[in-house]
Amino acid sequence: MDAIKKKMQMLKLDKENALDRAEQAEADKKGAEDKSKQLEDELVALQKKLKGTEDELDKYSEALKDAQEKLELSDKKATDAEGDVASLNRRIQLVEEELDRAQERLSTALQKLEEAEKAADESERGMKVIENRALKDEEKMELQEIQLKEAKHIAEEADRKYEEVARKLVIIEGDLERAEERAELSESKCAELEEELKTVTNNLKSLEAQAEKYSQKEDKYEEEIKVLTDKLKEAETRAEFAERTVAKLEKSIDDLEDELYAQKLKYKAISEELDHALNDMTSI
């Protein structure tokens, strides 16, 4: 664009110079005409006064001839100058048209740039909204991780209490042979519980694979944690009840040991599942 403007300025300068030369040629022409007229007047006067002086007549005739040649030369220069001016005018017109087209392209480019900047602003606002949502999801995940840790702590506490009960029952382990058949039934129930916990694990892994849809499954996930927490609280209550009934174990050793064995396996599996769930949450 600057090169075009410089070129246009140079062409305008050439035009002005050509106009100056044309004006100078016109002035020379006028001067020659004036001088020719003066010479003609003088020649007429001399012819009237010196009709017999051929030398003077030849002299002035030569001067008149020179003046006419200068006049013709001036006319030619003026014609050439006018042609140069016309050519420069055409070139200036072409440059101005080219400048108009360049300005039109520049205007189009500026309009496209403005549209691109608007689109970039919209994209930036969308990114900020996504970042805010991701931050909220992360905060919810941290809260649920804390809830899982609390549930694990409850499970560990339940295990500890059951271990204490088990130590108290070591002295009567010899009487627990009849509990084997019932233990098999308990193992079957534990297998069912294991399948249930595997389902929970699969749900947690599914949540990890579908992190972008986490907010939609958040209620279900919290409900699962609540169910596990309720089960652990129920187990803790049963453990406390079992501890209070240690004095009566001699009368109901078979039933109590069956319950103890089943509950111990059950809550050991729950504790392991909570560890897996916590690890899954940590890796999300």
From Swiss-Prot:
Residue ranges, annotated region (Disordered): 1-38
PROSITE patterns in UniProt: TROPOMYOSIN
GO biological process: actin filament organization; cardiac muscle contraction
Subcellular location field: Cytoplasm, Cytoskeleton
A molecular-function term among this protein's GO annotations: protein homodimerization activity
Keywords: Actin-binding, Coiled coil, Cytoplasm, Cytoskeleton, Muscle protein
Coiled coil (UniProt feature): 1-284
Entry's Gene Ontology cellular component terms: actin cytoskeleton; actin filament; cytoplasm
Compositional bias per record (Basic and acidic residues), positions renumbered to this chain: 12-38
PANTHER family cross-referenced by the UniProt entry: TROPOMYOSIN
Family of the protein in this entry: Belongs to the tropomyosin family.
Record note on domains: The molecule is in a coiled coil structure that is formed by 2 polypeptide chains. The sequence exhibits a prominent seven-residues periodicity.
The protein's role, per its UniProt record: Binds to actin filaments in muscle and non-muscle cells. Plays a central role, in association with the troponin complex, in the calcium dependent regulation of vertebrate striated muscle contraction. Smooth muscle contraction is regulated by interaction with caldesmon. In non-muscle cells is implicated in stabilizing cytoskeleton actin filaments.
Assembly: Homodimer. Heterodimer of an alpha (TPM1, TPM3 or TPM4) and a beta (TPM2) chain.
Name this polypeptide is given: Tropomyosin alpha-1 chain
Gene designation: tpm1
